Swiss-Prot record:
Residues 388-428 are annotated as: Disordered. Histone deacetylase that catalyzes the deacetylation of lysine residues on the N-terminal part of the core histones (H2A, H2B, H3 and H4), and some other non-histone substrates. Histone deacetylation gives a tag for epigenetic repression and plays an important role in transcriptional regulation, cell cycle progression and developmental events. Histone deacetylases act via the formation of large multiprotein complexes, such as N-Cor repressor complex, which activate the histone deacetylase activity. Keywords: Biological rhythms, Chromatin regulator, Chromosome, Cytoplasm, Host-virus interaction, Hydrolase, Nucleus, Phosphoprotein, Repressor, Transcription, Transcription regulation, Ubl conjugation. It comes from Homo sapiens (Human). This is Histone deacetylase 3. Disulfide bonds: none annotated. Interacts with HDAC7 and HDAC9. Interacts with DAXX, KDM4A, HDAC10 and DACH1. Found in a complex with NCOR1 and NCOR2. Component of the N-Cor repressor complex, at least composed of NCOR1, NCOR2, HDAC3, TBL1X, TBL1R, CORO2A and GPS2. Interacts with BCOR, MJD2A/JHDM3A, NRIP1, PRDM6 and SRY. Interacts with BTBD14B. Interacts with GLIS2. Interacts (via the DNA-binding domain) with NR2C1; the interaction recruits phosphorylated NR2C1 to PML bodies for sumoylation. Component of the Notch corepressor complex. Interacts with CBFA2T3 and NKAP. One of its GO terms (biological process) is positive regulation of ferroptosis. It catalyses: N(6)-acetyl-L-lysyl-[histone] + H2O = L-lysyl-[histone] + acetate; N(6)-acetyl-L-lysyl-[protein] + H2O = L-lysyl-[protein] + acetate; N(6)-(2E)-butenoyl-L-lysyl-[protein] + H2O = (2E)-2-butenoate + L-lysyl-[protein]; N(6)-(2-hydroxyisobutanoyl)-L-lysyl-[protein] + H2O = 2-hydroxy-2-methylpropanoate + L-lysyl-[protein].
């Protein structure tokens, strides 16, 4: 039975620019949306221009001092915030750029609205590719992430759902989400990520399992360089199957960071777009309300391919291997296909013995769980936002270019000869 899918896209979210040379390029969201439009996938979804999160919304998780700082700081006045910049870890990896707070408001609002719609059973699946910024902490920015939209969305889901499962397939450990829910059994966090050799953020060991009420409700799958589709699937599907069976979540949040693909600018895995998509399709197969978010991904053309393909899986619509012509067509050269070969020469250092050892340890930890922990009956607080369908347009009446513009910032894709988004560095 086909699911009702809500899709959140703000036409301005791709306008923001972290700065020349920075690997995080919000313009990847415009590429993704363009492919979603030109493949006609928008016809299979309810499309929303999302709510913008307020300071109050963000302070559900973050400290007021930190959010107040994000709202006030700008490139023109940052010299007066030297102490705060250091205190809140804003600087090189997490730069101050024009419209910083507005950017955070837009991607966070979309995740929050997706959670609210799932709570109200308006949709079965909610998609926000702009979200998934999993490194942000309560008091500070981290790893290109300022506001943790995932945590804020989960807090909203917890009003209606006794148990929320968080799954993270970004190459980097979902440390901000893990830290937020480390002491509770209301949220179970499962992260598959590269671990070791000082790889960012340096957390996510298999023996980080939670504490107090949350002991054993935190599950980490530390992986080595070069993992491929077969090895990843060998671990992902049995682990997630066991987690769902033991924990019985009533809602799932899936972070789909695309930096776990082969040929990613900051990555070291060997997943194909199909292999990455298999994880999304498998999670969808449990027929549990699902919030799907973006995350990392730094070879922008492949991020767009990946998230477009995964959108097609979520709406159960087959799409052609040949990319449709669009204003961004030239960025998908030389093949102009949906599934280019993104394998690299990185050796798969994840032996079958190593993966079996991880799986055995994880299964032993899962045996320590209480099956489906319960919560006491409580009054449900008011929704953080009031649902309003005024931004919804009928798919058949809405033109594919509605609410869409082509923003372009200097260096939005390539920052000179040393930017390894260029074709000369990576064979795609």
């Amino acid at each position: 039975m086909a699911k009702t899918v809500a899709y959140f896209y703000d036409p301005d979210v791709g306008n923001f620019h972290y700065g020349a040379g920075h690997p995080m390029k919000p313009h990847r969201l415009a590429l993704t949306h363009s492919l979603v439009l030109h493949y006609g996938l928008y016809k299979k979804m309810i499309v929303f221009k999302p709510y913008q999160a307020s300071q109050h919304d963000m302070c559900r998780f973050h400290s007021e001092d930190y959010i107040d700082f994000l709202q006030r700081v700008s490139p023109t006045n940052m010299q007066g915030f030297t102490k705060s910049l250091n205190a809140f870890n804003v600087g090189d990896d997490c730069p101050v750029f024009p419209g910083l707070f507005e950017f955070c408001s837009r991607y966070t609002g979309a995740s929050l609205q997706g959670a609210t719609q799932l709570n109200n059973k308006i949709c079965d699946i909610a998609i926000n590719w702009a979200g998934g910024l999993h490194h942000a902490k309560k008091f500070e920015a981290s790893g290109f992430c300022y506001v943790n939209d995932i945590v804020i969305g989960i807090l909203e889901l917890l009003k209606y759902h006794p148990r929320v499962l968080y799954i993270d397939i970004d190459i980097h450990h979902g440390d901000g989400v893990q830290e937020a829910f480390y002491l509770t059994d209301r949220v179970m966090t499962v992260s598959f990520h590269k671990y070791g050799n000082y790889f960012f953020p340096g957390t996510g060991d298999m023996y980080e399992v939670g504490a107090e009420s949350g002991r054993y409700y935190c599950l980490n799958v530390p992986l080595r360089d070069g993992i491929d589709d077969q090895s990843y699937k060998h671990l992902f599907q049995p682990v997630i199957n066991q987690v769902v069976d033991f924990y019985q979540p009533t809602c799932i949040v899936l972070q789909c960071g695309a930096d776990s693909l082969g040929c990613d600018r900051l990555g070291c895995f060997n997943l194909s777009i199909r292999g990455h998509g298999e994880c999304v399709e498998y999670v969808k197969s449990f027929n549990i309300p699902l919030l799907v978010l973006g995350g990392g991904g730094y070879t922008v053309r492949n991020v767009a391919r990946c998230w477009t393909y995964e959108t097609s899986l979520l709406v159960e619509e087959a799409i052609s291997e040949e990319l449709p012509y669009s204003e961004y067509f030239e960025y998908f050269a030389p093949d102009f296909t949906l599934h280019p070969d993104v394998s690299t020469r990185i050796e798969n250092q994840n032996s079958r013995q190593y993966l079996d050892q991880i799986r055995q340890t994880i299964f032993e930890n899962l045996k320590m769980l209480n099956h489906a922990p319960s919560v006491q009956i409580h009054d449900v607080p008011a929704d953080l936002l009031t649902y309003d369908r005024t931004d919804e347009a009928d798919a058949e009446e809405r033109g594919p270019e509605e609410n869409y513009s082509r923003p372009e910032a200097p260096n939005e894709f390539y920052d000179g000869d040393h930017d390894n988004d260029k074709e000369s560095d990576v064979e795609i």
